[in-house]
């Protein structure tokens, strides 16, 4: 399958490359491994076991990036304006600080306790062409956050992950790129792990 981005002008070069990577991979064992990794990670995050998430799922060299894009009319695309902005662009140490903030008893945002439910969908997996220890996973996430009976937020995003096999054959997240579609947040905050 090939996408001609000159003809299909709405498709970015990055998206065309990604669809080609996953479209040609038909490995059901790899797909199952990817689904298991994401399901286990989602469970740890849902129960707010953040330290366990860092220890068991996240590699020390991780790059965790959440961006938001500005969607422009076709007539505005001729200008070289920055379309994306970083919401988060963190490494392992910065994620660790954010985890400690979440666990701080003085963090008023967690009182009363928050409840999370994640839905991970559209999971696609493919091995890296050059590094056989690197697994590419594309997925969509819907995150439901509830606090009290009347304060509910729903987040949704597309994710592109890289999971690398390390010591003991365990895969850990080394890169997560989250494309968050809202330019203006409809929620109270984005203090969540997507």
Curated annotation (Swiss-Prot):
Keywords, alphabetical: Aromatic hydrocarbons catabolism, Dioxygenase, Oxidoreductase, Plasmid
GO molecular function annotation: dioxygenase activity
Result of changing residue 132 to E: In strain: G7
CDD domains: ring_hydroxylating_dioxygenases_beta
Result after altering residue 130 to D: In strain: G7
Pfam families: Ring_hydroxyl_B (PF00866)
Tagged with keyword Zinc: no
Pathway noted in the entry: Aromatic compound metabolism; naphthalene degradation
Domain of life, source organism: Bacteria
Stored Gene3D superfamilies: 3.10.450.50
GO biological process: 3-phenylpropionate catabolic process
Function, in words: Component of the naphthalene dioxygenase (NDO) multicomponent enzyme system which catalyzes the incorporation of both atoms of molecular oxygen into naphthalene to form cis-(1R,2S)-dihydroxy-1,2-dihydronaphthalene. The beta subunit seems to have a structural role in the holoenzyme. Also able to catalyze the cis-dihydroxylation of biphenyl and phenanthrene.
Description of how the protein assembles with itself and partners: The naphthalene dioxygenase (NDO) multicomponent enzyme system is composed of an electron transfer component and a dioxygenase component (iron sulfur protein (ISP)). The electron transfer component is composed of a ferredoxin reductase (NdoR) and a ferredoxin (NdoA), and the dioxygenase component is formed of a heterohexamer (trimer of heterodimers) of three large alpha subunits (NdoB) and three small beta subunits (NdoC).
Family per similarity comment: Belongs to the bacterial ring-hydroxylating dioxygenase beta subunit family.
Protein name, per record: Naphthalene 1,2-dioxygenase system, small oxygenase component
The species this protein was found in: Pseudomonas putida (Arthrobacter siderocapsulatus)
């Amino acid at each position: 399958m090939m996408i001609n981005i000159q003809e299909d002008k709405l498709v970015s070069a990055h998206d065309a490359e990604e669809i080609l990577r996953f479209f040609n991979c038909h490995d059901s064992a790899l797909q199952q491994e990817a689904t298991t990794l994401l399901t286990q990670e989602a469970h740890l995050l849902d129960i707010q076991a953040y330290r366990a998430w860092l220890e068991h799922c996240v590699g020390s060299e991780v790059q965790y990036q959440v961006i938001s894009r500005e969607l422009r009319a076709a007539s505005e695309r001729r200008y070289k304006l920055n379309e994306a902005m970083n919401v988060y662009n963190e490494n392992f140490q910065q994620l660790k600080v954010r985890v400690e903030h979440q666990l701080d008893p003085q963090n008023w945002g967690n009182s009363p306790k928050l409840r999370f439910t994640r839905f991970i969908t559209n999971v696609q997996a493919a091995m890296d062409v050059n590094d056989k220890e690197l697994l590419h996973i594309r997925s969509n996430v819907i995150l439901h956050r509830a606090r009290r009976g009347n304060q509910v937020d729903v987040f949704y995003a597309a994710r592109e992950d890289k999971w690398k096999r390390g010591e003991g054959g365990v895969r850990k997240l080394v890169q997560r790129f989250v494309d968050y579609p809202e330019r203006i947040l409809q929620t109270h905050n984005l203090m969540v792990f997507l």
